[in-house]
């Protein structure tokens, strides 16, 4: 993080929280999932983002890490080894247990923990977790009502079930990289871990649905959330297009989104995102731009005519927006109730007036990293607020605490540490 980025704004620091001194055992006492305990065997992005959301909602998340730690501890900007910006962003509201799961004693520790949790989440290949002895059948034998969620790359009923999967691979496989090649010579990845993050949110929904079923019936179940299938469903929600019908009148794709002119429009001093969507929007925009005749030329009152002429309309709009500044167009669009915004850079988001007003960003003191900025949970609950109670943990920060809760004696914990079955930081 650059020095300039360390300067937290006044809105953030006004309510600066000292999560560094939060008591981890008492912290998870609010939120709609308060009292729920989750055993988190995930790493990298998909699983950790999902379990962080559950933690934001009040669940007690026990993050089980290898003795080397989650891979994302080393990816991103870092002030200190093992605490990267990405790790800090997707691992708050968790307690860390560093455990050698491949050892017999480590497996015994996990078995004891399973007896006291409601949910187990992992993102290993199913064959790998089966070899460790913690496939669904083995875990359900220890805890019959557990909600067991496997985040996989590919569904286990298909021929690709054992293939490795990362975000780039899934973006390519699900059609996103192809979609993102419009106007370019080669396919390109979207510059965000969109497959990981989208599948992570799907995982949250799946876990909550399974928990609701358990609350009604008392029965746990196996839940699978495959990245590939999730992202194909995500991509085709609007892009299934002509493939919806048999025989297909056209190919896949939502035409309006695939036109080359669908991009931020140039202005005198930059660019603007403007979306005249209805016929009324387009008529008002053309009139404001001094070309009311174009509304009749393109037949904007008719949806089919708008769709047929959308590329030409985007082209004319881009020429018109060049004639005024971004601020002028924002003012015009606001008066006409046409959706529009300036182009906001990532670095400018913490100072965005709306985000400051709703308190999306928050300053906090981290036990090892000092003053940090985090993004608050965006979802609002009137009676059971989601909030940040714990900072992202150091590797093995809560090992002793978690083992004591599981019924281990101090001498047993010391023995596990000496034999490097577990490690404890701090």
Residue ranges of predicted features:
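A short glycine-threonine-serine/GTX helix/turn-capping micro-motif
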Residues: 188-198, 220-222, 252-253, 260-262, ...
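Substrate-binding/catalytic subdomain of NAD(P)-dependent oxidoreductase enzymes
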Residues: 211-250
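Aromatic-enriched alpha-helical interface/lid elements that frame and gate functional surfaces
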Residues: 255-256, 260-336, 340
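N-terminal helix-loop segment corresponding to the beta1-alpha1 unit
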Residues: 2-216, 242, 316, 394, ...
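Glycine-rich beta-alpha junction loops
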Residues: 68, 153-155, 227-232, 269-271, ...
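A glycine-rich dinucleotide-binding beta-alpha-beta segment and adjacent secondary-structure elements
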Residues: 335-389
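Short Gly/Pro-enriched turn/cap motifs at secondary-structure boundaries
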Residues: 87, 252-257, 262-264, 309, ...
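Mid-domain beta-loop-alpha active-site segment that forms a flexible
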Residues: 193-208, 227-235, 277, 281
